């Protein structure tokens, strides 16, 4: 259904827009000295991790190296999608696998990464500012364009803003950064994940409740009630628990026994493939349902504007090369399913969220490849 719906979309126009964006960013790469410094100063070991060799930096065949890191991510998503469409598994099997990923595999990966991490005295605050500044700009632009250009209800505008800025950091970002940047990138992403979901859900909930109150009236919950609910969810969040245990292990200097370390490594290694396959299985529920103009616009904001803003802020704040690469790559991934969950919670904006998720996932391989190439 996803593929058939996507086929009806104006592929020629989208391809032309993609080529124009590609040419613009390529010009930016060659003219902007900051990007050149970033590219030329990448250590050899990280360049190789990104699929880059010194020789291939100056030649087009480098794109095949990018594809070697990016293509497996989307192939695994496609495999998950096909297993449900072919009738091999029911869609609810994907939900069970997703629960395993969120509650066991990813927290274990975060624990292992942080327990062994060397932070080199880096502060997480610049990392958080870098990412969420990009989110704030993109979310605001998405909201304003939907409200005043597409003339939509304020509640639809909020959902569109969320869809333009809510990256699928867990199910696509983690495997992508792990393959492309390595452990240093996973450290950055683990620190981001500690507050990403709470911040995005608090902001989305408050804005939606305010928008609903403006549109239809009725009782509005106070911010204290919202923070209380989110705080309650936060202390039981498996990602936060994995982060706290990992940091505690790192600070205390406790070493895992060989047997326990092997178990942790094996579970952590399952996080990426299981996350991608479960996402593909879940995508059978998120089809293109309408509001194509808004959805395509939000997809462009999500895949191009958000990572561009993140790169600009990270460069301005002097964030390390590896952390900047990790944040830009994870911000370039498709829209996460939480955008649809918020729409479902408030009973409006389903088509905008679902269509943006579907279109951004179908075209995400292009944006991820583009940003991996630019970062090289």
Predicted regions and their residues:
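Extreme N-terminal basic, low-complexity initiation segments
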Residues: 2-10
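Intrinsically disordered, low-complexity segments enriched in serine/proline and basic residues
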Residues: 9-12, 37, 54-57
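Low-complexity, intrinsically disordered or signal/transmembrane-proximal segments
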Residues: 20, 27-30
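Alpha-helical transmembrane segments of multi-pass small-molecule/ion transporters
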Residues: 32-33, 45-376
């Amino acid at each position: 259904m996803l593929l058939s719906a996507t086929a009806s979309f104006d592929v020629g126009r989208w391809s032309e827009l993609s080529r124009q964006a590609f040419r613009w960013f390529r010009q930016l790469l060659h003219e902007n000295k900051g990007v050149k410094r970033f590219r030329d100063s990448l250590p050899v070991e990280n360049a190789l991790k990104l699929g880059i060799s010194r020789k291939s930096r100056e030649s087009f065949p480098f794109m095949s190296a990018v594809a070697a890191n990016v293509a497996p991510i989307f192939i695994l998503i496609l495999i998950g999608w096909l297993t449900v469409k072919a009738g091999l598994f029911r869609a609810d099997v994907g939900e069970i696998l997703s629960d395993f990923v969120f509650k066991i595999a990813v927290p274990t990966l975060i624990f292992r990464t942080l327990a062994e991490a060397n932070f080199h005295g880096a502060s997480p605050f610049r990392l958080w500012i870098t990412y969420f500044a990009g989110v704030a700009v993109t979310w605001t632009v998405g909201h304003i364009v939907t409200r005043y250009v597409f003339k939509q209800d304020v509640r639809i505008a909020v959902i569109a803003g969320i869809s333009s800025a809510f990256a699928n950091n867990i199910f696509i970002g983690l495997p992508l950064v792990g393959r492309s940047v390595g452990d240093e990138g996973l450290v950055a992403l683990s620190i981001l994940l500690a507050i990403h979901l709470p911040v995005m859900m608090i902001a989305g909930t408050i804005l939606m409740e305010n928008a609903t109150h403006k549109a239809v009236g009725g009782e509005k919950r106070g911010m204290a009630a919202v923070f209380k609910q989110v705080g309650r969810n936060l202390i039981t969040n498996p990602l936060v628990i994995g982060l706290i245990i990992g940091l505690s292990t790192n600070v205390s200097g406790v070493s895992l026994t060989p047997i326990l370390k092997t178990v942790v490594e094996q579970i952590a290694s399952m996080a990426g493939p299981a996350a991608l396959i479960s996402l593909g299985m879940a995508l059978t529920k998120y089809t293109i349902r309408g509001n194509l103009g808004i959805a395509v616009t939000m997809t462009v904001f999500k895949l191009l504007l958000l990572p561009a803003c993140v790169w600009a802020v990270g460069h301005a704040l002097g964030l390390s090369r590896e952390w900047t690469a990790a944040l830009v790559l994870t911000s370039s991934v498709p829209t996460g399913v939480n955008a649809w969950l918020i729409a479902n919670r408030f009973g409006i904006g389903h088509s905008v969220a679902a269509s943006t998720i579907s279109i951004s996932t179908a075209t995400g391989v292009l944006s991820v490849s583009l940003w991996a190439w630019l970062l090289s």
